[in-house]
Amino acid sequence: MKKTFSFWVVFLWCSVFVHANELRPDGLIFNDYPGSTVLVIDKSACRLMVYKFQESWKMHRVFPCTTGKVNGDKFREGDLKTPIGIYWLNQAWAGWELAQYYGNGANVYGTGAFEVSYPNYFDQVIERKNGDGIWIHGTVKGDPIPTRGCISISNYNFLELTRSVELGATPVIIEEKVTFSPSAVIAQEQQFLMGTIESWKRAWESNDVDNYLSFYSSNFLTEKWNFNSWQAHKKSVSTQNKRRRILLNDLSVLMSKNIYHVRFVQTYTSSSINDVGFKHLFLVKEADGLKIISENWTPLNQLSPSPAFQYAYKESQQNSM
């Protein structure tokens, strides 16, 4: 089934009242596609929760876990902390693959590992974090023990977890303490966010550059641009390329530390440019509404050729919003 943006905006209105009283993590704003899985890790409670969506979000499994030896958010390599934020699982290793690479040192990872996409773009550009090698992995034997920053579960539970994970398509929400709200409350936030994204897209597509730039924070920052240089760049582009079509597919909206992480497949078509890739928007609530504080776009042909990425590319070539 095509996962188009406009279809799910309508779907949200229909689903709000059906499951209004069900509780779910506050960070799980929207990834409402049948069969979708989101992993939610509560560091303080030492548990990894597996949420699955059919008609609504349900907690499918809960696994005891351990995290870094030191509490708090990760900022530096070697600080022994587990990062807090929104991440994706992009690579996996079986135990024998780890043994080939690490030798006897691989025993600590148990039966296998998933790579967590730390540091993500927001971590690097806005929060200036460093370090890497954060995994969800098994354990030597028995129950997991505190780690150098990874998330560890028992080997049996790791094998169970592999049944739910799709590389490139399964997000991970990591929090010090997970909070929950009724689905009806989160649905209101969904509508507000979806409306903002739709208005941003329309302003961009219609070449209304002043309206388009109004969606950006004065603190906007990427690896290449700050707000002033971005504003000048976009005004220049708008005079050269006045007609464009923008399609958004496979949208997800997740939240951590009051930052909304929006990800979608973006297909951009104009008289001079035709491209498709993953766009990430990072939004924050400011006094005058939601604002984009950073964004990043990656061409699909530069990403891992995992089944999830290939599927997203194929889907983006079909009709959408």
Predicted regions and their residues:
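Exported/periplasmic cell-wall-interacting domains
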Residues: D79-L80, I84, W93-E198
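Hydrophobic h-region of N-terminal signal peptides that target proteins for export
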Residues: V10-A20
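Positively charged n-region of N-terminal signal peptides that target proteins for export
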Residues: M1-T4
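Short, well-ordered alpha-helical segments enriched in acidic and aromatic residues
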Residues: S206-N219
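Short beta-strand edge/turn micro-motifs at domain boundaries
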Residues: V276-M321
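Short, solvent-exposed aromatic-acidic interface loops
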Residues: P64-N71, I136, T267-Y268, S294-P305
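Surface-exposed, charged secondary-structure patches
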Residues: K81, N107, H233-H280
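Gly/Pro-biased beta-strand-loop elements
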Residues: L23-G133, A308
